Amino acid sequence: MSTTYQLVRNQAALFDFSSEGRFFIKGTDAIEAVNAVIASDLEAIPELKALNTVVLDESGAIQAIVWVLKTEDGIWVLCDPDRHTLLAERLVASAMKCSAEVDDLTEFTMCLAVIGPAAQKIAMAAAGEDVIGIPYLGFEANEQTDTLLCRLGYTGEFEFRFIAANERASDLRAILLEAGAEYGLEIGEVSDLPLLMLEMRSLSQREHIPEGTNPIQAGLHWMVDFQKENYPGHDAVHARKADPGRKALMLQFETVTPPVGDQTVRIDQQDVGRCVCVAFSPTLGKTIALAYVDAALAWVSVVFDVAGLDARAVSAPLFITKTAASPQ
């Protein structure tokens, strides 16, 4: 078990997300400009709320998974580091068609995140008692830390992100580490997050979603507003609802050691899918996997064969986290 895993599941870890893309879209048509790019409907949510959604190409394939934060003055869009250039191009092209302007603030801002069951208490110690009132997908301009404070996350644990100007980096890091000292807060490794996400069936685009996959296949249909019209990939995604081909499915082995070699998923010696990620879950004490299998077989409790081992399809999240089990 890695130190980061233990911290996130039992205490809290501090992560530096500064390499992620951060855009601020402003102007009279800021909502229109962003809405033309994403598959959810930004007009359907109030200010000070966030969306977790996808940007698609015309074939319906996922190009980026993004957070979209709606403020009174404009729209924040956050993305993975390797999607920065692509998203910048899409946002700028959309903004040029209306009265909106895209500010790429990635190089001028930074982001620190506290993740774990103790993260809310740490955020309250650093940013004030009112932080307890921030709901999931909520955020505020926090005066005490001079940051945009967001409650987001994929791990099933509390996650509070602090976005600030670059010059605040050292001070903010010190404030958070001091606030978290009594809770055992330590620096976490971003590379350990995909496993923590997978246990909740939150998907890392880099680790869990092959290029060309659409949201129906990935099980991310909840990131799409199927009542919305006129976004890239609309027709293709609707067509995939009836014929997804293969769909993502969580598998659980009874073994501790992950299977090696061939990751093909089989039933009765017939190839029906493939694992894209296999890992050991310290909390379960078992090996888990994410596989894309023929849609007709993508059902909980079906037992597959992977490298000669039984792999049972299971529902997710795979367990109740300490955050979910604690009084909110």
Where are these regions (language model features)?
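Short amphipathic alpha-helices in soluble, non-transmembrane regions
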Residues: 37, 89-94, 126-127, 172-181, ...
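Residues forming anionic-ligand binding surfaces in small-molecule and nucleic-acid pockets
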Residues: 7-10, 17, 62-72, 143-158
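Short glycine-/aliphatic-rich beta-strand segments at the starts of folded cytosolic domains
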Residues: 13-37, 105-122, 244-253
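Well-ordered mid-protein domain cores that form the structural environment of catalytic cofactors
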Residues: 45-94
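Glycine-rich, small/acidic residue-mixed loop/short-helix segments
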Residues: 58-61, 212-328
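Acidic, proline/glycine-enriched N-terminal capping motif
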Residues: 1-56, 60-63
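Glycine-rich, acidic
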Residues: 99-244, 252, 271
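Helix N-cap motif at beta-to-alpha junctions
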Residues: 28-29, 80-85, 117-119, 165-170, ...
